[in-house]
C-alpha cells in the first residue's frame, strides 16, 4: 500500500502539548508551591518565645536522584531527590544566630512523560476537580414553600461561614454548620457599630430588624456579643470575653488557620465587586458586609443580584499534581512543627542546632502516604499509548476533599453547558463513576487559578482574525460573549458567509448576524477528548456508543505487527508523540548509528545524542512495551521527528488494531447477539497476535526454624522436573514452561508438628533425620504457559533493598504469544463490540466477486437500534481507500464544508475507486456500498447484496485465556468451609439465591441438595463422596452443611435453647461427625449439666 494519505479536512491548528497539565503543575510546585509552604511555615517559636527557627524556603535545593528512571524501575526503588533547606535558629535572649542546611525528606520527581516511579511502578496523579473557594448564593424553600436565600463563604482551608434569611426577615449566621446566631451579634463581636454596618448597606431597612432582635436578646455591646458567640460555638464551656475574642480571631482572621487562597480572594472580589488586594487571604469586615448587602439585594430582588450555579465550571476548579502535593507537604510540615516545638522546650538552649530540631520523618511519611495510598495516585494504565495519555488527562471529582460516589447526585454528573470545549461530554466511565470522572477536551488547558480554559479566534465586524495565538477564555468569561461554533463557513479572507449565525450566549442559543459575533471556536474537535477525537465520523454515532468506542480504544492490546487505520482523523501522530511511547529527535542532524537497542543522532556541531530503545519490557497491564527503529543510517532528521515506533504505533502514528475486510450479514446464527465470526487468516497470519509478559516472584524468608533456601535439592521431585533449573534451582532464560512446572526451587524448614506419622516412625527406628524441609517452590499457575525471557535475583549483598525478613528475592518473567481465539473480545471504534464465536477456514468464508474471502462477518442487526452509523461510513470509506491504495484522514464534524458532507465524500471516493482499471465492480450505482457475495462452502451467490469494506478492528485486553477457569477439588474458606471464589484462588462458581430458585422451580431436588452439601460445605459428606467416586461406589447420603452448624452455634451463643429434632421429637446431634468419641450432646442440656456435676 502506498504511503500517500489524503486529507479530507484540515483542522485549524496543531493541538497543544497533551501532557502539559501534569508537567506545568509539577514545575509550578518546584518553583513556587514548595517555597510558599516553607516560608508560610516559619518562624517557629518555642512556648517561652526565646527561640525562633526560620526556614529560608527560597534557598531549598534538590540533590541529584540516586537512581535514574530505568534503574529505579529495575530496583523497585522510587525515582526521588533529596530535599535540603537552609534553617536559621535565632536565640532572642543572646541574639545568637545558627545557620545550617538541613535534610527535610525525599521528594519523588516527575519523569519527562508526566509520571512518577514509586517503588518501581509507574504511577499517575490524577487531576481533581473541586468546588472553588469563594462566596456562593443559593435559594432554598422552607416547609411552607417560601423562598429563603443563603450565602456561604467557603475558604480554601478553615471554617465555613453561612448567612441565611428566614420568614421573619431576620438574618442569621452559622459557623461551620453549628447553631444559628443572629447576624448582628457577629457584627458586634467583630467590633462594628450599628452605623458602620448600616452605612455599608444599600437597603438598611431590611437589616434593622436583625439589630432590633439583637437588642431584644440583651446583646448590645461587643463584650456581650463575644460571650454569646462563645456560648454558641463552644457550648458547655465557661464563656469569657477574651475566649470569645480569641476564638473569633483564630477562626477567621488568623492566616495560619484561615486561608481563602489566591482563587478564593479572586472569586470574592469578582462576585462582590471588591478591590481587596490579592495578598489578603483572610476574611475582612468588607467581605462580610458586602456578602450581607448582596444577600439582602437577593431577598428584595433588586440591584441585579444573581444566584450561583455550583456545577458551572466557573465555580469548579482543577487541583493538579502540584497543588495536591503542596497540600500534602503542608500536612507534613504541621506535624513537624509540633515536634520542633517540643524539642525546643526539652533541649538545652545553648547547644541546640537546627539539624537536631528538624526531623525529616513526618514530612517523608506525608509524601509517601500521598504517593502510595491516596485515591488520586493511581497505578498507570499502560495497556497502550492512548490509555497512558488519557490517564494523565483524567479529571476526577472523587478523592480527599471531593465527592463520594454515594453522595453525588445527578446534577453533578450531568453535562453542563460550560463543559463545552473544556471537559469531554462523551468520554466517561459507564457505571457508578459516570460523570464523576471526566477527560480534558483536546484544546483545553488549566490556568493559574485552576479554571479550565479553551481557545477562540476573535471576530471583528464579522471577520474571523486568525493571526497570532488564539485567545483562551475560562467558563465565566465566556458566558459574557457571543460564541459561534468552530464549523462556521468563511470565505478566504475570513468573512463569515451566512446571514444569521447560531451562537451561545449566557448558556443559551440565539441566532445573530455575523457583526454581533464576538468569538469563534478554534476547531470542531475542541469539544471532545483525545480518545473520542480518534473516532472517524463520530458525529454520526449515538453518544452512548461513542462513549463505549472511546473507552474501548484504551483497552486495545498492542499487536505484534500494528497497522495504522486506513480511515483516521489526523490526530494519530500527535497522540503517539505526546504519549511518550515514541522517541523523538531533540536536534537537527544525521542518524549515524542504528540497531535494535539504540539510535545515535549526530547534530550539525558534531555532538552525539543517544536514544536507548525499550525492548520487550513488561507494562503495568502485562502487555509488551517494545520500540522498533524507523530511521536508517545516514537519514537526515529534524527536531521533533519520530525515530522509532513504540508499542501500538506504526510510522509514528498510533495503530491500535488492524484494517480487516468486513461483511455485514448473518451467517448460520454464529453472529447472533453481537457474536463475531472470523476467518482463520487472522490466526495464521498473526494479524491479531499479541505478546504478554507475566511476572512471578518468590522470596526466601528467615523463619523461626531457620532460613528458607533457594535450591535444586527439592524433596520427592523427579530429576526430569528439574531439567531446566540451573545449579541454584532457578529456571534458565529461554526455557519453555507449562502450568505446574517449577520456576524457582525453594525449601522451607519444617517443625516437629509438620511431620507425617510414617516419617516419625522412620526416625524412631533408624534415628536418622530425614531432611526436615518441605517443598515450597514457585510453580507456573494453572492455565499459564510461555517462555522465560528474564530472571532477576535480588540479594542484600548486591545492595538491593528487600522487604523485611527476606534474604533473597527472585523474579521470573514469562512471555507468551497469544493468537486470537474463540472467546476473545473484539471491537470497532464505534462501540461495536462482540465476542468471537467461531473461527472458520478461509475457504468457507463468504468471498467477493474477485475471489477475496472476507475476514470478519458481523451482524447487520447491530447497527440500526444502536444508531452508530459511523461504522458504516468508516467501512465504505475504508473500502474506497483500500482500492485507491491510499489512507484517508477525516476530521469529525465536517458539516462546515456543506450539508451531508460525509455522505457525499464517501460516495465520491467510491466512484473514484471504481474508475481504476479492472475495479469496475467495486461500486454498483444501483446498490451503492453493497456487493454481491458468494458463499464459500457452495459457491452460490447470497440472495441480497451485502455491505462490505475495510474497518479498523481492535482486540481488547479482555482475553479468554485470563478468564477461563475450572475447578474439581480445591481450597475451602476457613469459617464457612465453602469453596473460595475467583480464578486466583482456584475457586468455585457461586450458587446464589436466584440460582437456587431456578433449581427449585424445576423440582431438581437431588441436584440442589448435592450443590448445597457435598459440593459445598458438608465436610464429612464431601470426603465420603470423593472416596466413593474414586472407588466407583454409590455416593452416600449427604450430611449437615457446616454453615448450618455455624448458624446454630451463633444462635446458641445468644443464649437461645435451640436444637434440631426429628419428627418423633428425638434430638439430632449435629456435632457427632466432628468428634465421634464425644458422648455429650451438641449443646449443653440440663441433663448433661446435671451429670457433669454428679461426676465432680
From Swiss-Prot:
Transmembrane annotation, as ranges: none
Recorded GO CC terms: DNA-directed RNA polymerase complex
Matches recorded under InterPro entries: DNA-dir_RNA_pol_bsu_ext_1_sf (IPR042107), DNA-dir_RNA_pol_bsu_external_1 (IPR019462), DNA-dir_RNA_pol_su2 (IPR015712), DNA-dir_RNAP_su2_dom (IPR007120), DNA-dir_RNAP_su2_hyb_sf (IPR037033), RNA_pol_bsu_bac (IPR010243), RNA_pol_bsu_CS (IPR007121), RNA_pol_bsu_protrusion (IPR007644)
One Gene Ontology biological process: DNA-templated transcription
Catalytic activities: RNA(n) + a ribonucleoside 5'-triphosphate = RNA(n+1) + diphosphate
EC number: 2.7.7.6
Keywords: DNA-directed RNA polymerase, Nucleotidyltransferase, Transcription, Transferase
Region listing for Disordered, in residue ranges: 1069-1096
Any GO molecular function: DNA binding
Pfam families the record matches: RNA_pol_Rpb2_1, RNA_pol_Rpb2_2, RNA_pol_Rpb2_3, RNA_pol_Rpb2_45, RNA_pol_Rpb2_6, RNA_pol_Rpb2_7
Role this protein plays: DNA-dependent RNA polymerase catalyzes the transcription of DNA into RNA using the four ribonucleoside triphosphates as substrates.
Family, as annotated: Belongs to the RNA polymerase beta chain family.
Subunit text: In cyanobacteria the RNAP catalytic core is composed of 2 alpha, 1 beta, 1 beta', 1 gamma and 1 omega subunit. When a sigma factor is associated with the core the holoenzyme is formed, which can initiate transcription.
Protein's UniProt name: DNA-directed RNA polymerase subunit beta
Organism: Prochlorococcus marinus (strain SARG / CCMP1375 / SS120)
Amino acid at each position: 500500500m502506498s504511503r500517500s494519505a489524503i486529507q479530507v479536512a484540515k483542522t485549524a491548528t496543531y493541538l497543544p502539548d497533551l501532557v502539559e497539565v501534569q508537567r506545568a503543575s509539577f514545575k509550578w510546585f518546584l518553583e513556587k508551591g514548595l517555597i510558599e509552604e516553607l516560608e508560610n511555615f516559619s518562624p517557629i517559636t518555642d512556648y517561652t518565645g526565646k527561640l525562633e527557627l526560620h526556614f529560608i524556603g527560597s534557598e531549598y535545593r534538590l540533590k541529584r536522584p540516586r537512581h535514574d528512571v530505568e534503574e529505579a524501575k529495575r530496583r523497585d526503588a522510587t525515582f526521588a531527590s533529596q530535599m535540603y533547606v537552609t534553617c536559621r535558629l535565632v536565640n532572642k535572649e543572646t541574639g545568637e544566630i545558627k545557620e545550617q542546611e538541613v535534610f527535610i525528606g525525599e521528594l519523588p520527581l516527575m519523569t519527562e512523560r508526566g509520571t512518577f516511579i514509586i517503588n518501581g511502578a509507574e504511577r499517575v496523579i490524577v487531576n481533581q476537580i473541586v468546588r472553588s473557594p469563594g462566596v456562593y448564593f443559593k435559594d432554598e424553600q422552607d416547609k411552607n414553600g417560601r423562598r429563603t436565600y443563603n450565602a456561604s463563604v467557603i475558604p480554601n482551608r478553615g471554617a465555613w461561614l453561612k448567612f441565611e434569611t428566614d420568614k421573619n426577615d431576620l438574618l442569621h449566621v452559622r459557623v461551620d454548620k453549628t447553631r444559628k446566631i443572629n447576624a448582628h451579634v457577629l457584627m458586634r463581636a467583630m467590633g462594628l457599630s450599628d452605623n458602620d454596618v448600616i452605612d455599608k448597606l444599600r437597603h438598611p431597612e431590611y437589616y434593622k430588624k436583625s439589630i432590633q432582635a439583637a437588642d431584644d436578646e440583651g446583646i448590645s455591646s461587643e463584650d456581650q456579643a463575644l460571650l454569646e458567640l462563645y456560648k454558641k460555638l463552644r457550648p458547655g464551656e465557661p464563656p469569657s470575653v477574651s475566649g470569645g475574642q480569641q476564638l473569633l480571631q483564630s477562626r477567621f482572621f488568623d492566616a495560619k488557620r484561615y486561608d481563602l487562597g489566591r482563587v478564593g480572594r479572586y472569586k470574592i472580589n469578582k462576585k462582590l465587586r471588591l478591590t481587596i488586594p490579592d495578598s489578603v487571604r483572610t476574611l475582612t469586615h468588607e467581605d462580610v458586609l458586602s456578602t450581607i448587602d448582596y444577600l439582602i439585594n437577593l431577598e428584595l430582588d433588586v440591584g441585579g443580584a444573581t444566584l450561583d450555579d455550583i456545577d458551572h465550571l466557573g465555580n469548579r476548579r482543577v487541583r493538579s499534581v502540584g497543588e495536591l502535593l503542596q497540600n500534602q507537604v503542608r500536612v507534613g510540615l504541621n506535624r513537624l512543627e509540633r515536634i520542633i516545638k517540643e524539642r525546643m522546650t526539652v533541649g538545652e538552649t545553648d547547644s541546640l542546632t537546627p539539624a537536631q530540631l528538624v526531623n525529616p520523618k513526618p514530612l517523608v511519611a506525608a509524601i509517601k502516604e500521598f504517593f502510595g495510598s491516596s485515591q488520586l495516585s493511581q497505578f498507570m494504565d499502560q495497556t497502550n499509548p492512548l490509555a497512558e495519555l488519557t490517564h494523565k488527562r483524567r479529571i476526577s471529582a472523587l478523592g480527599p476533599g471531593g465527592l463520594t460516589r454515594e453522595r453525588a447526585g445527578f446534577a453533578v454528573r450531568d453535562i453542563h453547558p460550560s463543559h463545552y470545549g473544556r471537559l469531554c461530554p462523551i468520554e466517561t466511565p459507564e457505571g457508578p463513576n459516570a460523570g464523576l470522572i471526566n477527560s480534558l477536551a483536546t484544546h483545553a488547558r488549566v490556568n493559574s487559578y485552576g479554571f479550565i480554559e479553551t481557545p477562540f479566534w476573535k471576530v471583528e465586524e464579522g471577520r474571523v482574525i486568525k493571526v497570532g495565538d488564539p485567545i483562551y477564555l475560562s467558563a465565566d468569561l465566556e458566558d459574557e460573549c457571543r460564541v459561534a461554533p468552530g464549523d462556521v463557513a468563511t470565505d478566504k479572507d475570513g468573512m463569515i458567509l451566512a446571514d444569521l449565525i447560531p451562537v451561545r450566549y449566557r448558556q443559551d442559543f440565539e441566532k445573530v448576524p455575523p457583526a454581533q459575533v464576538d468569538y469563534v471556536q478554534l476547531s470542531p474537535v475542541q469539544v471532545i477528548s483525545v480518545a473520542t477525537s480518534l473516532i472517524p465520523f463520530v458525529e454520526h454515532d449515538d453518544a452512548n456508543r461513542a462513549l463505549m468506542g472511546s473507552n474501548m480504544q484504551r483497552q486495545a492490546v498492542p499487536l505484534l505487527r500494528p497497522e495504522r487505520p486506513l480511515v483516521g482523523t489526523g490526530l494519530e501522530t500527535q497522540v503517539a508523540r505526546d504519549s511518550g511511547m515514541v522517541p523523538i529527535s531533540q536536534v537537527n542532524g544525521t542518524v549515524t548509528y542504528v540497531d535494535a537497542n539504540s539510535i545515535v543522532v549526530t547534530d550539525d556541531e558534531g555532538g552525539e545524542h543517544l536514544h536507548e530503545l525499550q525492548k520487550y519490557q513488561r507494562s503495568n497491564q502485562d502487555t509488551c512495551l517494545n520500540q522498533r527503529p524507523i530511521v536508517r543510517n545516514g537519514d537526515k532528521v529534524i527536531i521533533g521527528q519520530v525515530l522509532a515506533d513504540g508499542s501500538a504505533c506504526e510510522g509514528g502514528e498510533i495503530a491500535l488494531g488492524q484494517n480487516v475486510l468486513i461483511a455485514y450479514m448473518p451467517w448460520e446464527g454464529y453472529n447472533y447477539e453481537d457474536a463475531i465470526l472470523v476467518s482463520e487468516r487472522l490466526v495464521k497470519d498473526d494479524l491479531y497476535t499479541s505478546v504478554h509478559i507475566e511476572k512471578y516472584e518468590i522470596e526466601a524468608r528467615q523463619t523461626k526454624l531457620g532460613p528458607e533456601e533457594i535450591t535444586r535439592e527439592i524433596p520427592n521431585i523427579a530429576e526430569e522436573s528439574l531439567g531446566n533449573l540451573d545449579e541454584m534451582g532457578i529456571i534458565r532464560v529461554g526455557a519453555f514452561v507449562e502450568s505446574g512446572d517449577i520456576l524457582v526451587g525453594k525449601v522451607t524448614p519444617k517443625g516437629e508438628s509438620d511431620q507425617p506419622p510414617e516419617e516419625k516412625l522412620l526416625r524412631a527406628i533408624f534415628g536418622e533425620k530425614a531432611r526436615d524441609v518441605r517443598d515450597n517452590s514457585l510453580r507456573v499457575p494453572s492455565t499459564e504457559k510461555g517462555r522465560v525471557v528474564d530472571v532477576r535475583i535480588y540479594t542484600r549483598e548486591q545492595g538491593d533493598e528487600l522487604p523485611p525478613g527476606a534474604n533473597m528475592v527472585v523474579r521470573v518473567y514469562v512471555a507468551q504469544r497469544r493468537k486470537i481465539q474463540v472467546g476473545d473480545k473484539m471491537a470497532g471504534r464505534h462501540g461495536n463490540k462482540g465476542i468471537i464465536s467461531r473461527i472458520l477456514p478461509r475457504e468457507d468464508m463468504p468471498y467477493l466477486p474477485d475471489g477475496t474471502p472476507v475476514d470478519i462477518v458481523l451482524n447487520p442487526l447491530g447497527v440500526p437500534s444502536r444508531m452508530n452509523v459511523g461504522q458504516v461510513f468508516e467501512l465504505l470509506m475504508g473500502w474506497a481507500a483500500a482500492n485507491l491504495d491510499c489512507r484517508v484522514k477525516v476530521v469529525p464534524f465536517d458539516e462546515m464544508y456543506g450539508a451531508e458532507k460525509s455522505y457525499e465524500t464517501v460516495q465520491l471516493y467510491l466512484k473514484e475507486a471504481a474508475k481504476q482499471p479492472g475495479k469496475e465492480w467495486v461500486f454498483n450505482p444501483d446498490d451503492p456500498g453493497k456487493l454481491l457475495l458468494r458463499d464459500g462452502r457452495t459457491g452460490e451467490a447470497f440472495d441480497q447484496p451485502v455491505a462490505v469494506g475495510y474497518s479498523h478492528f481492535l482486540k481488547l485486553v479482555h482475553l479468554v485465556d485470563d478468564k477461563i477457569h475450572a475447578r474439581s477439588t480445591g481450597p475451602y474458606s476457613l469459617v464457612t468451609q465453602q469453596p473460595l471464589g475467583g480464578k486466583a484462588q482456584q475457586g468455585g462458581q457461586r450458587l446464589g439465591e436466584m440460582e437456587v430458585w431456578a433449581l427449585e422451580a424445576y423440582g431438581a431436588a437431588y441436584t440442589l441438595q448435592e450443590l448445597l452439601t457435598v459440593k459445598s460445605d458438608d465436610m464429612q459428606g464431601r470426603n465420603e463422596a470423593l472416596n466413593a467416586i474414586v472407588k466407583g461406589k454409590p455416593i452416600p447420603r449427604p450430611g449437615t452443611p457446616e454453615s448450618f452448624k455455624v448458624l446454630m452455634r451463633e444462635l446458641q451463643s445468644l443464649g437461645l435453647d435451640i436444637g434440631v429434632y426429628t419428627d418423633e421429637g428425638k434430638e439430632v446431634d449435629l456435632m457427632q461427625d466432628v468428634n465421634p468419641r464425644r458422648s455429650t450432646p451438641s449443646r449443653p442440656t440440663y441433663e448433661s449439666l446435671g451429670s457433669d456435676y454428679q461426676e465432680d
